[in-house]
Amino acid sequence: MQDIRQETLNECTRAEQSASVVLWEIDLTEVGGERYFFCNEQNEKGEPVTWQGRQYQPYPIQGSGFELNGKGTSTRPTLTVSNLYGMVTGMAEDMQSLVGGTVVRRKVYARFLDAVNFVNGNSYADPEQEVISRWRIEQCSELSAVSASFVLSTPTETDGAVFPGRIMLANTCTWTYRGDECGYSGPAVADEYDQPTSDITKDKCSKCLSGCKFRNNVGNFGGFLSINKLSQ
């Protein structure tokens, strides 16, 4: 369970957000390997992206299917990485196709990256502004001379736990406004700051329980209100 920092939530609602950077940690220590840190891009200095003092080496890597799902079976994302010089082939042969390894996905707004990434530094650098999700490598679905693809599963699927397979937030709804999980399809009510409006172009959800109350839709709130009580 992770609380998303308020500064990151504020960045989500800005009209002009900074770029979202996805950082990947592939931890193969449980299957006899090492930890690898990759990013699909470089910083503005043409160097590896640095986050929390750690460098993430530029390497072709792409994830898909990480959208939140509140219905049916758990999400099964796919991670595709370059098989440059046969690196993945060698590891897959030595470590049972990497099954059982851990994949950590970090999303960070460029606004909060370490100052060392920028020519003129960064006064907004904040190592706590990240959103993390953890996954297990369930199977190697494709392996060629060009790339390798892996199907991921949530740790709860492999350890027998029964928590929902998504980030659990107490006061923030993670559903897409007016999407299937949200279920609201009525007229315009309020903007993202819960200010009343009848303009459909300004109608946005605040992602808070108050937004659901405005729309008489509390039953579909996508947060976990009881989590706050667990630490009391």
From Swiss-Prot:
<dbReference type="GO" id="GO:0046872">
    <property type="term" value="F:metal ion binding"/>
</dbReference>
<keyword id="KW-0004">4Fe-4S</keyword>
<keyword id="KW-1227">Viral tail protein</keyword>
<feature type="binding site">
    <location>
        <position position="205"/>
    </location>
    <ligand>
        <name>[4Fe-4S] cluster</name>
    </ligand>
</feature>
<comment type="function">
    <text>Part of the distal tail tip complex which plays a role in DNA ejection during entry, and in tail assembly initiation during exit. The tail tip complex is assembled successively with three tail tip proteins J, one tail tip protein I, one tail tip protein L and one tail tip protein K. The tail tip complex interacts with tail measure protein to initiate tail tube assembly. The formation of the tail tip complex is completed by the addition of tail tip protein M, which is followed by tail tube polymerization.</text>
</comment>
<feature type="binding site">
    <location>
        <position position="182"/>
    </location>
    <ligand>
        <name>[4Fe-4S] cluster</name>
    </ligand>
</feature>
<keyword id="KW-1243">Viral long flexible tail ejection system</keyword>
<dbReference type="GO" id="GO:0099001">
    <property type="term" value="P:symbiont genome ejection through host cell envelope, long flexible tail mechanism"/>
</dbReference>
<keyword id="KW-0426">Late protein</keyword>
<dbReference type="InterPro" id="IPR006487">
    <property type="entry name" value="Phage_lambda_L"/>
</dbReference>
<keyword id="KW-1245">Viral tail assembly</keyword>
<feature type="binding site">
    <location>
        <position position="173"/>
    </location>
    <ligand>
        <name>[4Fe-4S] cluster</name>
    </ligand>
</feature>
<dbReference type="GO" id="GO:0098003">
    <property type="term" value="P:viral tail assembly"/>
</dbReference>
<keyword id="KW-1171">Viral genome ejection through host cell envelope</keyword>
<dbReference type="Pfam" id="PF05100">
    <property type="entry name" value="Phage_tail_L"/>
</dbReference>
<feature type="binding site">
    <location>
        <position position="212"/>
    </location>
    <ligand>
        <name>[4Fe-4S] cluster</name>
    </ligand>
</feature>
<keyword id="KW-0946">Virion</keyword>
<keyword id="KW-1162">Viral penetration into host cytoplasm</keyword>
<dbReference type="GO" id="GO:0098015">
    <property type="term" value="C:virus tail"/>
</dbReference>
<dbReference type="GO" id="GO:0030430">
    <property type="term" value="C:host cell cytoplasm"/>
</dbReference>
<dbReference type="GO" id="GO:0051539">
    <property type="term" value="F:4 iron, 4 sulfur cluster binding"/>
</dbReference>
<keyword id="KW-0479">Metal-binding</keyword>
<keyword id="KW-0411">Iron-sulfur</keyword>
<comment type="similarity">
    <text>Belongs to the lambda-like tail tip protein L family.</text>
</comment>
<protein>
    <recommendedName>
        <fullName>Tail tip protein L</fullName>
    </recommendedName>
</protein>
<keyword id="KW-1160">Virus entry into host cell</keyword>
<keyword id="KW-1188">Viral release from host cell</keyword>
<keyword id="KW-0408">Iron</keyword>
<keyword id="KW-1035">Host cytoplasm</keyword>
